[in-house]
Amino acid sequence: MSAISSQTQTALLLPSVGASFELQQIPIPQAGSGEILVKNYAAGLNPIDYKTQEVGFHVVREFPAILGFEGAGIVSAVGAGVTHLKEGDRIAYQGVASNKGRSFQQWVVTPADWAFKLPDSMSFDTAAALPIAFLAAVIGTYQPPPHGLGIATPWSASGRSAHAGSPIVVLGGTSNVGQYAIQLARLAGFGTIITTASPRNSPLLQALGATHVLDRSLSIEALTGEVEKITGEKKVLHVFDAVGIAETQQAALAIVSEGGKVLTTNPPQVKASEGSGKQILFVMGALMMPQHQAFGKEFLSVWASLFESGDIKASTVEVVSGGLNGVETALKQLKTISGKKLVVRPFETDV
């Protein structure tokens, strides 16, 4: 149980775009109808945090702003109408479009319908690193166009053999989204899973399910040639671009066969040639978005079993020391690392 002994909490606020973060004492929010109050034991760090700090993000409309778009903790109170969760439940959540729902603070209010109820074996640190990267991979893989690649889910009838023998390419395999995309491709039965990464990360990605790891430094022409050597006459109808910059989007369109689909994690900066039948799609990985809600309810009923069974392995997590005091430095570190997630523990903040 998570009793509240104070009416205030420690939070990390961004006064304005381009400013440095500041620790402040603010009121603990209250759960409204359909919401839960969460004692926030861990918060995940993501590129969107430093991008918001540096140049802004359209979802963050109020300043001073609390950032942090994923976290995990214990339900401390439930609002009216919440029946499927109770005080003491362990959950993870995605940060929503208001200060009270973001994770760089000690207490968070979030919609109950989109909370991930955690398996007993999963730590808060691991869980806090899931909602952004894992959901981007899940939605981008399973939702039909224009929101995803439309690949069969592993919990559907024949879903694990629907793509048997087919090739798929995942650009940016060492990224957290890429690691999950590789594993989801393996669960879908793809016979050839090609990814790009630094050669030193090949063992990690092969353990997750990649059959071929190509050097990420290859030119688009060289990369396309290597993919063609591997796939032969088989069409590449699915490419997951987990990097999402203009160069990788161009590479993805060069690799994908006519009539195929490219899924990218950032808005497309390039277009498919007219008449090619190729599609370039953009994933917005939030279950609470109207276009994802029906799928989200189905997914939340099965997601934990994917980890409990060992079908999916969570990304490596590194806990940043200092609680919320460590966020500013950690966001700089985030720009230079790959293959793991950074999390902070808000209740370890010294004030």
Model-derived segments and their meaning:
Residues 27-45, 54-100, 114, 119-122:
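Glycine-rich beta-strand-centered segment in the early N-terminal region that forms part
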Residues 10-11, 89-90, 261:
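Residue-level marker of beta-strand positions
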